[in-house]
């Protein structure tokens, strides 16, 4: 019987095995895909390397840094400058949003309208602030909301912003408001102290985040862990003192503890005996947003300096543009660069179903329309599709998660959901890793860490213009 079985070989799953190894335990990992890393993997095509979404290696948690440094050697890391901007109506805006830059770019008339709109909502705030639209409008005013938040947010989620829970806004921008942004522009906080930006540089593996998890995979195998790729779990059946885990390939494993990074929505369908109808319905109601990236090889050495640009322009479908050469010069070839256009989609919709050739043509047309590249400078392109990339925070997601959490706590205390999809939480890479570390310590050391509290009650760096957050437990 295996002491610990881990479902998924992304950052959470591999970190769980890494932590278990420190306590003298070997694990079995079952990964449904043919490669490791999950959404943090790096794709290689014809000598070009590109991420599935960008992953800055920055955290406030020392343990996470220690794990990164244990997996990769010092010379495997680069220290890269951080730069991101918003593109809107042929102008670039600082990201995170800075009042001085935003109001200057908008022009004096529009700036006055935005400020007046902000003071209007201070007097007459939206009554119902449980959805994204009203929550943000109450803190920035309706005009700034419509300019900088509505279009991009609805691109990401594919639904009206009134159907997105306020949790999404509060998690990503926490207590920031227009007034705080203005104070930040002058580098002053409530106490009159100078605010400093916590991150203007970040660590990054030479060959992308996939380098981290590919190396972890190889080292774990050398340490004696079992890792089976293309091995998708189809059933978890509970017995007196153990579980039997069955894969689609017909393999059966007897295990004591399970760490699962499979989508939380799928867990109730997988476990036998079946849960109550409330739990099954809650799982069915958890939604995901899918994702595809079109990587274009451009016949220019430096298209722009940013790591990525958020596209708030309503006239194009692309949501964000990655500049892989800005992440690492080792990702691209000399004299050329590679840009990744990110599209937020649903499996089966028009974009997801479009063939690669047409997607490459669309991406090229949109980059040229935005004047981010010169015409006829695209040399080749590649498409990568990623299902279930983003857990959706709709108005009922929290209740659905609570129902599943309560069921697992009462009926399956030896099953530990970990990671972004495993917990249906929009976690950063470091948060996902910490859910794995804390779960292993609960098993091995008898600790009582509440995994569900990680990345819930915290002050986000976004509030002071860093765009990142750090996991804490309270």
What are these regions (language model features)?
Residues 2-29:
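N-terminal Rossmann-like FAD-binding beta1-loop-alpha1 element of flavoenzymes
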Residues 112-116, 120-236:
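Active-site/ligand-binding neighborhood in enzyme catalytic cores
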Residues 395-474:
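C-terminal lid/capping helical subdomain adjacent to the catalytic/cofactor pocket in oxidative enzymes
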Residues 361-405, 416-417:
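Flavin (FAD/FMN) cofactor-binding core of flavoprotein oxidoreductases
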Residues 42, 64-87, 143-147, 288-289, ...:
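A short alpha-helix-loop-beta-strand transition element characteristic
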Residues 46-124:
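Dinucleotide-binding Rossmann-like beta1-alpha1 core, especially the glycine-rich loop
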Residues 23, 231-357, 361-372, 376, ...:
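Mid-domain catalytic core of redox enzymes
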Residues 21-45:
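Glycine-rich FAD pyrophosphate-binding loop
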